[in-house]
């Protein structure tokens, strides 16, 4: 999603978010990621000012103190950025890819099922189709990507081939590199 993102050309405008809308965003995040309930006020303090950045292709970025913490495509779900995920990685559903998939993952490739179901990978059974998950790598501590599952964990384990997770945002992509003043 962010391979071709260019912060100088794609950003069309910024708007401060009202506190009532900010509460709604926090509620949507907690609904989508229930484990965030305990830490949501630390991640997005009540008196802080969220800013919405409108970009090309109906993409919205949400920043806090100049740091992109959330993004949303059109009316889709609000998705945490890796910068937010690194602050509380245990609050999100995680999968792990084996060592062989790391270089492909960090170059923006989609995650293939064999990298998830192999010995070094980890694919929890409760993952459903069209669910956003955090992708970690074997032997690494920090989350490396955020992806959207293309099928359930059960289906992935049965087929054992093809694309399992669409790589939406990864370490080193243009969203990760974007620094706002």
From Swiss-Prot:
Alphabetical list of InterPro entries matching this protein: MCT-1/Tma20, Pre-PUA, PUA, PUA-like_sf, Uncharacterised_CHP00451
Gene3D superfamilies, A to Z: 3.10.400.20
One Gene Ontology biological process: formation of translation preinitiation complex
Lineage top rank: taxon: Eukaryota
PROSITE patterns: PUA (PS50890)
UniProt subcellular location: Cytoplasm
Chief place where the protein resides: cytoplasm
A GO CC term assigned to this protein in UniProt: cytoplasm
Pfam families listed in its UniProt record: Pre-PUA (PF17832), PUA (PF01472)
Molecular function via GO: RNA binding
Function: Involved in translation.
PANTHER family: MALIGNANT T-CELL-AMPLIFIED SEQUENCE 1, MCT-1 PROTEIN
Protein's name in the database: Translation machinery-associated protein 20
Organism: Schizosaccharomyces pombe (strain 972 / ATCC 24843)
Gene, per the UniProt record: tma20
């Amino acid at each position: 999603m962010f391979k071709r993102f260019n912060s100088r050309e794609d950003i069309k405008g910024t708007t401060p978010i009202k506190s009532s809308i900010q509460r709604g965003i926090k509620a949507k995040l907690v609904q989508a990621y229930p484990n965030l309930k305990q830490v949501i006020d630390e991640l997005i303090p009540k008196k802080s000012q969220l800013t919405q950045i409108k970009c090309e292709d109906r993409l919205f970025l949400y920043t806090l103190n100049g740091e992109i913490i959330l993004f949303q495509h059109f009316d889709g779900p609000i998705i945490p950025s890796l910068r937010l995920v690194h602050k509380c990685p245990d609050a999100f559903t995680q999968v792990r890819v084996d060592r062989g998939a790391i270089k492909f993952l960090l170059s923006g490739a989609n995650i293939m099922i064999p990298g998830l179901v192999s010995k070094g990978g980890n694919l929890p059974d409760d993952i459903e189709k069209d669910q956003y998950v955090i992708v970690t790598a074997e032997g690494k501590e920090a989350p490396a990507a955020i992806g959207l599952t293309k099928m359930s964990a059960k289906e992935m384990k049965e087929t054992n081939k093809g694309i399992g997770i669409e790589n939406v945002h990864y370490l080193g992509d243009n969203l990760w590199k974007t620094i706002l003043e």
